Curated annotation (Swiss-Prot):
Any single Pfam family the record assigns to this protein: FGF
GO terms for MF: chemoattractant activity; chemokine binding; cytokine activity; fibroblast growth factor receptor binding; growth factor activity; heparin binding; histone H3K9me2/3 reader activity; identical protein binding
Effect in UniProt of substituting K188E: No effect on integrin binding
Name assigned to this protein: Fibroblast growth factor 2
The species this protein was found in: Homo sapiens
Amino acid sequence: MVGVGGGDVEDVTPRPGGCQISGRGARGCNGIPGAAAWEAALPRRRPRRHPSVNPRSRAAGSPRTRGRRTEERPSGSRLGDRGRGRALPGGRLGGRGRGRAPERVGGRGRGRGTAAPRAAPAARGSRPGPAGTMAAGSITTLPALPEDGGSGAFPPGHFKDPKRLYCKNGGFFLRIHPDGRVDGVREKSDPHIKLQLQAEERGVVSIKGVCANRYLAMKEDGRLLASKCVTDECFFFERLESNNYNTYRSRKYTSWYVALKRTGQYKLGSKTGPGQKAILFLPMSAKS
C-alpha cells in the first residue's frame, strides 16, 4: 500500500513469483497449487533434428567407428557393390568395385578364360605335299596290278601312259634311238623321247623307248645304251627328291645315276653322284 495525497492506494503492479524468478518454470514451481498436474497434461514435443544430420553417418564418419567397421567386414562379403573389399574368386557378379572379377569363359574381358583343349599332335611320319604332290623320298611310278585283280608278279608289257624325262641340266629330253644310242634333245616333237616307265617292284622301274622298242640299260663301264631285251642292268631305283625332281639310280651299280651333260650327251655313271643337276629329271606327259 502506498499513500498518495494523504490516501492509501493499493499497488497492483504485477510482479513475478518465486518460481518465475528462478526460471524453473511450472515444472519446478512448487508454490502454485496444481502445477504438477497441469504440466503433465501438456503435450511433450521432441526436439527437432536437422535432416542432414544422421547419427549413423556421423558415427560412420568418425575414425574410430570407421576403423572398427572395416575390421569387422568379412572378406568377399560384398557382391555387386562399389566397396573396396576384395571379393572371393568368382564372388563378384557384375559389380564395379575393385575386387577380383570372376573368371570369364569364352568372353572378351580381361579375366582368364578357360583354354580350349588342344588337338592331339599329328603322328610323326611323312606328310603329303601341297596340292597332292608327294613327299621327298617317295616314288612316282606305282606297281602295276594284274588285270584279274589278284596278287602276284607284275605282268610284262603292262605300262602306264608315255612320259618324257626332262633333264634339269641343259633342258634336254632323254631320247632312246632304234639303234640303241642314248642322248638328249630339246625338241618336244621328236618321237623318240616318248618313254614308258614300268614298275618292276616298289621303287624300281624300267624305262622303255616307245618308238625304239628298247630298254634303257647301264653297262659295267658306266655307259648308257638301249637293250632289246630286259636284263638286270635295265632296272633303276626311282626317287623323288626335295626339289620335286626324280633321280634314277642303277640297281646293279648302286652308286651310278642316269645323267645328261649340258651338251646333250649322256654322262658316264662313274662320274655321277648325288647333288648334281645332271641326274635330275622331271617326268612330263607325252600327250601334249
